Amino acid sequence: MSIVEIKQQATQKMQQSLESFQHNLTKIRTGRANPGLLDTVHVDYYGSMVPISQVANVALLDARTISVSPWEKGMGAKIEKAIRDSDLGLNPASQGDLIRVPMPAMTEERRKELTKVVRAEGEHAKVAIRNLRRDANDGVKKLVKDKLASEDDERRSQEEIQKFTDRFIADVDKLVTGKEQDIMAV
C-alpha cells in the first residue's frame, strides 16, 4: 500500500466516522420537532419490522409537531403504538388518518443531561478519528521501515494526516456546539 492510498483510506474512514456521528446526533431529541427523530422507530408490517418512513409519510406540521400519515388505513394504530413504545418519550395522538406527534417541552435538568450525552458522543467521534490518524501514521512508518518510502515522505505525510485529522475534529466540535445550542434553546 502506498502513502497516497494510506492517506485516502484514512480520510475516507474519518469521513465515515463523522457521518456516523452526525447520524447519532439526529437521534438525540431537542426541543424542536425533527422528522429524522422517528427514523429509529420500527413498526410491524405484515410480519416484518420496518422503519415508519417505509409505511407512512413523516413531515413537520410546525416547529414542535411531527405528522405521520400512514399509506394504509390499518397501520395507524400500529404506528401510534410503536411511537409510544419507543424510548423517545413521545405521546402520539391520532386524528383520523393523521397521527400528530407533539414534542414535549424539556426540563432544564433534561437539557443539561442531553448536553452531556452530546459531548460524550463527540468525544467518542474524536477518539475514533484520532485512532484512524494513529493507524495511518503507523502504516506510513511501516513503509519507511520496509524502505518503501523516505523519512522526508514520512514527515510530510504525517503533517498532512494531522491537518485532515484537525479538520475532522473541528467539524465534530462544530456539530457538538450546534446541537448543544439546539438543546439549550427554549
Curated annotation (Swiss-Prot):
The keyword Transmembrane helix is annotated on this UniProt entry? no
Q: Which InterPro entries match?
A: Ribosome_recyc_fac, Ribosome_recyc_fac_dom, RRF_sf
Q: What Gene Ontology cellular component terms go with this record?
A: cytosol
The molecular function GO annotations come to: ribosomal large subunit binding
* The entry's keywords: Cytoplasm, Protein biosynthesis
Localization (cell):
Cytoplasm
Record-linked Pfam families? RRF
Q: Name one GO biological process term.
A: cytoplasmic translational termination
The text of the family note is: Belongs to the RRF family.
What this protein is reported to do is described as: Responsible for the release of ribosomes from messenger RNA at the termination of protein biosynthesis. May increase the efficiency of translation by recycling ribosomes from one round of translation to another.
Q: Which NCBIfam families is this protein grouped with? A: frr (TIGR00496)
Protein name from the UniProt record: Ribosome-recycling factor
**Organism per entry:** Polaromonas naphthalenivorans (strain CJ2)
